[in-house]
Amino acid sequence: MTATGRVLRCLRQSYFENERSIMTLPTREEAYALLHEWVESESLRRHMIAVEAAMRAYAHHYNEDEELWGLTGLLHDLDYERHPDMDDTENGHPRTELRLFRARNYPEPLIHAVEAHATFLGVPAESLLDKALLACDELTGLIQACAYVRPDRDIRSVELKSVKKKWKDKAFTAAIDRQENMHFIEALGVPFDEHVQRVLDAMKGVAVELGVAGE
């Protein structure tokens, strides 16, 4: 890294630390308790934990704040179970959780990323955090499904080539829009194979929590 790059990083870290002193990021324990308070569905909890793992992996890759990125992933669908009607312009996902996050003075980068991941709201994905959340969100669901259909039901046995094969099979997890998600990955600026491998490896690290550590 050049001297200029180091200076810019220090300035960015100093700015972010100042922002964090004003805003309040919950601890992981607090965020996890909030998840259990709001979400009863085991599958949705697992999805949110999977996205958390992927976001932490990307934060590490980019030398960003792993707590901020991880908790953004963990909390991004907090109100979905209670308010799944996205056409409800008052309370529909993610409007209720955004009000909660603002009321609790959560960091603006977390709030903006959660808002931007609901593309129908029209909020542009601008930061790396925003773009990573979009690129990781639905891919974790496809990878989770890849583990579910394995005889051993173990995500640690899933390989990149298997995920790529299922990605091409549009009947598999048909609700996932491949074209839209490829756009998100391209916006993040990471090669497809590298992106899938990073998310897959991150999810393997939380196999037990995801319920895909083998029968």
Model regions and ranges:
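Acidic/His-rich, divalent-metal-binding segments that scaffold phosphate/diphosphate chemistry
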Residues: I22-T89
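Low-complexity, intrinsically disordered or signal/transmembrane-proximal segments
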Residues: Q13-Y15
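Charge-biased, low-complexity intrinsically disordered regions
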Residues: E194-Q197, D201, E209-V212
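Acidic, Ala/Val/Gly-enriched low-complexity intrinsically disordered segments
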Residues: A3, V7, E17-E19
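Divalent metal-dependent catalytic cores for phosphoryl transfer on phosphate-bearing substrates
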Residues: Y62-K170, M182
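C-terminal binding/interaction regions
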Residues: A171-H195
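Conserved active-site and cofactor/substrate-binding residues in soluble primary-metabolism enzymes
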Residues: P26, E30, R46-A50, G92, ...
